């Protein structure tokens, strides 16, 4: 039996990143309920989210290699996921303006028999952002499917 590589995400950015290494994979978005997940730190939270997404898809694809990921922005202990509205995106961007924060990405890989997960974190510093820049940016579709309302890759 040939196992497949499955990306447990509907994220266009995750698809793009994985495509840099291989085009031989399938995409199956997870139906994992993130709302009930809690943790004592943002890094632990994102690892649990990635693991939950990965295992939810792996349960439907035994024997395949499933990759699940999640990212959160940590601003002094406050977790920013994807903004829920224009005002939420503006609030996040104002908090990030001129400040340093952490970005945590959880990664989980499972083949059904073994599951491994880890977190990678980095510090990001924003230059100050004007209200006009925030208004222009939030008027686009860019911030609404990204943790912290921004994508560092552009």
Model-derived features with residue positions:
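Short glycine-rich, Thr/Ser-proximal phosphate-binding strand/loop in the N-terminal lobe
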Residues: 24-39, 115-121
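Short linear Ser/Thr-Pro motifs
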Residues: 9-11, 30, 97
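N-terminal beta1-alpha1 ligand-phosphate binding loop
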Residues: 1-23
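Anionic-ligand binding patches
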Residues: 2-6, 40-154
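Short loop/helix-cap segments at secondary-structure boundaries that form the rim of catalytic
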Residues: 16-20, 37-38, 59-60
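Generic alpha-helical hydrophobic packing signal
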Residues: 15, 28, 109-111
